[in-house]
Amino acid sequence: MNARTTYISIDQEQAQYDVAKKTVLDDNCKRVLYIAGRRDGYVTEQRLKGMKRLVKDLDLTMMVRQGDFSELTARNVALKYAKNKDVVVCASDLMAIGAMNALIDMDIFRPVCGFDGITLMGYVGKQMNTIRQDFYSISSRAVEEVHQLMNGGEGHQVIMPHSIVKMYYKDIIC
């Protein structure tokens, strides 16, 4: 980032920590399968930091596997590793959907949580915790920041709020 660049995001580390903590505590879990995003990605690293902090804070064990933000890859990871874990935490909703489908296929129940708050989560039979980013507010703030930069202002980092939600089918239908 430089003087002419503004970065707008949520606190990726804290958001991952928050949604995983809620899911872990709601179901009294101790053994975590964390399905991370793309190897060496900034968002992946930030979210993994949140998970490592949670593991330390709550004295959990965690296995980390790459899911590449892919539903199919996450499904395969869950098929291979979820059986001996108490919870599956995913770095994206799409991966959470893949992991949940794997658990359904194996006929086992494990809580699963995602990240992003995508509409598709509302179509999954089980409601999962996820992080909702207020893209309207983020977009509005981005327009304000562009205007400021165009008028000689300096760039800076802007951290926007996030929330933990469950996506329900009834909330997404018209």
Name what the model sees in each region.
Residues D26-D27, K80-K83:
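Phosphate/pyrophosphate-binding loops at sites that engage ATP/ADP/AMP, CoA/4′-phosphopantetheine
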Residues T5, K30, D86-V87:
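Conserved acidic residues
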Residues K83-V87, A91-C174:
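Flexible loop/turn connectors
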Residues K21-V32:
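Nucleotide donor/acceptor-binding cores
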Residues Y7-D18, Y34-K56, L60-V77, C90-I97, ...:
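Hinge/beta->alpha junction and helix N-cap segments in small-molecule ligand-binding domains
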Residues N2-T6, M121-V124:
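A short acidic, helix-capping loop that chelates divalent metal ions and anchors anionic groups
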Residues R4, D59-T61, F109, Q127:
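A generic structural signal for alpha->beta connector loops
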